[in-house]
Amino acid sequence: MKVSSQTPGELSKKKFELLHDARYWDSPQFKLISGFEPKGSQPQAIEKLVEGLKKREQFQTLLGVTGSGKTYTVANVINQIRKPTLVIAHNKTLAAQLYNEFREFFPENRVEYFVSYYDYYQPESYLPAKDQYIEKDAQINPKIEQMRLAATASLMSRQDVIVVASVSCIYGLGNPENFQKMGFELKVGDKVQRKEILEKLIDIQFERNDMELMPGRFRVKGDTIDIIPGYFDDIIRVELFGDEVDRISEVDKQTGQRKEDMDYFFVYPARHYVIPEEEQKSAIRSILEELEEHLPTLGLLESHRLKQRTLYDMEMIEETGSCKGIENYSRHFDHRQPGEQPFCLLDYFPEDFLLIIDESHQTIPQLHGMYNGDRSRKKSLVDYGFRLPSAYDNRPLKFEEFEKYMENVIFVSATPSDYEREHSARIVEQIIRPTGLVDPEVEVRPLEGQVRDVMQEIRKIVDRGDRALVTTLTKKLAEELTEFLARNEIKARYLHSDIKTIERTEIIRELRLGKFDVLVGINLLREGLDIPEVGFIGILDADKEGFLRDSKSLIQIIGRAARNSSSKVVLYADNMTESIKKAVDETERRRSMQIAYNEEHGIVPKTIRKPIREKVVDITDTKHIPKTDIPNVIIELDAEMREAADRLDFERAIQLRELIKKLEKEVKAV
């Protein structure tokens, strides 16, 4: 059935059901698999959130304390509501953690991962003051590109789909109408010529390569066509008998063994940006019309530059179907009006989907800010003749455009901001932890002598075998405090923003192992610092209002001590600021509720000791490796690189890949 072109919003809300193949309506339901039952505040939180969704309440907030099992609560809600779900996190690391957790909860359903696919990205820009043009430079991670394609293919073919995404989900993506229309189905018994299948594959940006198969490629041997879709790991083998599809099967890429036969397979495009040939010609005409209209508004130099560049791009598109920076012409290919919102991942969802915004106090501001940053960068490119004005429309959504998709929303945060509180029909608290652990005891002490007092508290903590965190206002203070503690025979290290993720992970591991006892830092709110060994947190200069000393930040920092049953937090301040008062009062309120619940149910909280993972091998020094051992080391590193990519630790995988390249050069030099 042909679907007429729609704007992104109209397409999502009116025509979605026409864009799906038959499997979509027969796909399985969500099935939550877990070895434990909801406990603490989880049962009532699940019940209230489900009730709110069934009553069609547009916004709800899950206010859950650290360690209360918010992800498990959300998984239970998804399991009961049974709608395709988008979970948005504010960074890749958190998105990867959530993706892995949801995969464990829903092993029989489709859990997908959608983040930016750039390992490295330098956007195109122009600096008028220096007359310096900076060309776009990017390195795409093929594994993440494959996972992005898998997310959209799953949304087109199934209902039991959870997509965990970063804010990349509001950036421009190919038209879902084209993505579906240009795909094609293969059925056993269909009458189709081999040439027709090959032409269709080429049309949707598959590459023929009879030597090396990888996602987005196909090979041909006689009447057998092997395809690896862009969102697949294994081979789809299509065997023809004359002009008839005789057999379709999934074949293990590594072993060549047939895994299963299938009656039907739908081949989606190998890229998100696919354009039918007739639309391509129409788009080129539209681009040239815009060029003619815009040239008179520019100076002589800018006009010449833009005309030369645009005509070259059009020639490339006509010859090859693409050009460098083709995304800047996306408005023309999508037949959108100037200023009209682009298609994005949200347009691949049905109208009635569930939206979870994790750590909403950080994610909502990110969603707000994306459009303005993109617009300001492109202004000089347009003003100085490097891009047509239509480049503005290759952009992320404005926040008000994003809000149109917010029909069934759950904000998740320990410290919701004003936006969440003002919009939510209900705020569901999850205060009681399944483990019985309570929020730490909080004290406020004078600033005078704060360093000496912190040192005394640290000594007590170290004597009982626990660790301490101390947060300062500046990097210089963190360094000075670390040196002071070291002079007083206390093993301390400091953490700051210059330290890379891998080093940071190793520092936290060494803290847990007891190689040092105190971690000093400025921003201790980042993920990965929920350490059960931490029995004391000292917050220096707590009455200096501002970043990291507002009530939300203080509550978050206090929560870092909530995984230890004997923990304590001390805020050093001479003035009881409004932020301190709110943080202390809220912590005491939660603590009282938790203690009362434990007494009523006879629960004695115990610190849960998480296993400490193995050390990340130091891979920066290769000088000690004997030349004869390098080939074996490369094999081991390659295996480790693939494992890192599988667990979505792409920073580690990139580091390993670069080391492998370095070692391969050494082998060639021998």
Curated annotation (Swiss-Prot):
Residues 51-433 form the Helicase ATP-binding domain. Residues 453-612 form the Helicase C-terminal domain. Residues 631-666 form the UVR domain. GO terms for biological process: nucleotide-excision repair, DNA damage recognition; SOS response. It holds the Pfam family ResIII. Keywords: ATP-binding, Cytoplasm, DNA damage, DNA excision, DNA repair, Excision nuclease, Nucleotide-binding, SOS response. It is found in: Cytoplasm. Belongs to the UvrB family. Forms a heterotetramer with UvrA during the search for lesions. Interacts with UvrC in an incision complex. The beta-hairpin motif is involved in DNA binding. This is UvrABC system protein B. It comes from Methanosarcina acetivorans (strain ATCC 35395 / DSM 2834 / JCM 12185 / C2A). The gene is uvrB.
